[in-house]
């Protein structure tokens, strides 16, 4: 009578065991050396890279350690942070043993699918909570701007969960837990794996993220043909820019633009100092623009 429930329960236990092994608790002394700070993270690579949140390690002055399930804490160091996406990468001490990395799922999260948050909320190590993906394409406000395309979940996320993985039913990472809405129940957020996949290699290779700028501000707007479809429209532009206010961005270097993040994703480090072909819809017609890309200064709080 209960076979299916027992099978489901056993499969969940196996899933949690797999993810728990590769999830870490991160601790360190604060800048004032008054006490410990704590957060979570997870193994990203076979070289010992650990992904977590920027706000977890920001302000950790010394004694930075990572601890795997059932193991002694080992030293780690920060090798890169990106405040704008609230991501950071640590490196385990040379020669320290660590479990296999978790696999990321780059297919988008699906509204309503089961998900699991793993980490150390409120210093309760090796905790897991279950929920569903309860919202997509959310914007998480931070001191450095909004984090685009984030995942909303009703899996319990509390202080200390930050930086830990949000995984699907196969144990693949679909997001990095980052925050909860303090004024509500069961509304938590995770940085989508799509963002993690773009930012983390930059942090590993360079220690920071360089972003390009087209000299415009953009926003989502409804199409003016009466259809129930949103487009990305130019909201503000500089006097010397080839864009005009109201231009609808159709593509960047022939890649279609459907979200604000599609434009941001195109403005990566390797295009800074070059030009991009941007196709816009202006007065009902397609116009091809050749736009110089300049380096955008990092945002500050």
Region annotations inferred by a language model:
Residues 1-6, 114, 174-221, 279-301:
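Interdomain regulatory linker/hinge segments that flank or connect interaction modules
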Residues 21-26, 41, 48, 52, ...:
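Terminal peptide-recognition signature
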Residues 156, 202-269, 285-292, 296-299:
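PDZ/PDZ-like groove recognition
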Residues 2-6, 30-37, 43-126, 257-260, ...:
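Conserved active-site neighborhood of the chymotrypsin/trypsin-like protease fold
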Residues 22, 93-102, 128-185, 193-198, ...:
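Active-site region of chymotrypsin-like
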Residues 1-28, 33:
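Protease-domain processing segments flanking chymotrypsin-fold serine proteases, especially trypsin-like
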Residues 34, 56, 100-106, 111-146, ...:
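Flexible, gly/ser-rich surface segments that form the specificity/activation loops bordering the active-site cleft
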């Amino acid at each position: 009578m209960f076979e299916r429930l027992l099978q489901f329960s056993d499969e969940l236990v196996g899933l949690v065991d797999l993810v728990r092994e590769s999830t870490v608790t991160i601790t360190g002394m604060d800048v004032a050396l008054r006490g410990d700070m704590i957060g979570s993270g997870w193994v990203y690579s076979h070289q010992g890279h650990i992904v977590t949140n920027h706000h977890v390690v920001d302000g950790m002055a010394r004694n930075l350690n990572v601890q795997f399930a059932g193991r002694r804490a080992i030293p780690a160091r920060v090798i890169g942070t990106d405040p704008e996406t609230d991501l950071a990468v640590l490196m385990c001490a040379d020669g320290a043993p660590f479990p296999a990395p978790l696999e990321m799922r780059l297919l988008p999260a699906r509204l309503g699918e089961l998900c699991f948050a793993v980490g150390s909320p409120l210093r309760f190590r090796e905790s897991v909570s279950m929920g569903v993906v309860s919202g997509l394409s959310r914007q998480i406000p931070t001191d450095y701007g909004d984090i685009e395309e984030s995942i909303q979940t009703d899996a319990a996320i509390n202080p200390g969960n930050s930086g830990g993985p949000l995984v699907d039913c196969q144990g693949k990472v679909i997001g990095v837990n980052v925050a909860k809405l303090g004024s509500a129940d069961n509304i938590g957020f995770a940085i989508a794996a799509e963002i993690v996949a773009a930012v983390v290699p930059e942090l590993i290779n360079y220690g920071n993220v360089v972003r390009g700028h087209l000299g415009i501000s953009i926003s989502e707007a409804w199409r003016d043909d009466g259809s129930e479809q949103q487009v990305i429209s130019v909201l503000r532009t500089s006097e010397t820019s080839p864009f005009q206010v109201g231009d609808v961005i159709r593509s960047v270097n022939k890649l279609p633009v459907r979200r604000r993040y599609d434009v941001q994703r195109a403005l990566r480090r390797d295009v800074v100092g070059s030009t991009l072909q941007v196709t816009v819809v202006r007065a009902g017609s397609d116009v091809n623009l050749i736009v110089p890309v300049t380096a955008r200064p990092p945002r500050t709080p």
